[in-house]
Amino acid sequence: MAETFHFSISMISRGKSKSAVASAAYISCEKIKNEWDGEVHDYHNKKGLLHSEIFLPENVPIALKDRTTLWNSVELNEKASNAQLARNFIIALPKELSLEENKDLIRDFIQENFVSKGMIADLAIHQGNDEGNGNIHAHIMTTVRPLN
């Protein structure tokens, strides 16, 4: 297994001039318009995305499985100029495991630590520029409070 392990946590907040929509567009390599400020965040040409998926707790509207709907709902729900919008996690994954094994590993982690506690989680697994499985890592964004 890995000799070193990276795990970082940060807050995405307007007080730090950050946007949940911009962060979601970046990690998912998508183009998403932020309905809060009208800005379009376009990362569809970004390379390295291996997998993305949204996890919903029970009793959450299925419409929030759509990334644009989810993060725009968060942006529009929070009114304060310094609002905390999402938690952001970056986790190194074991390069010794296959992509499918890493997906299973991170899915279990997300279910146990976030979804079971009522949070929505947005996962993106990235591959660095290395050949093979080097620098494989997960980006996870979670909601700060329940949405319904």
Indicate where each model-derived feature is located:
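N-terminal nicking endonuclease/strand-transfer module with a His-rich metal-binding environment
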Residues: 1-148
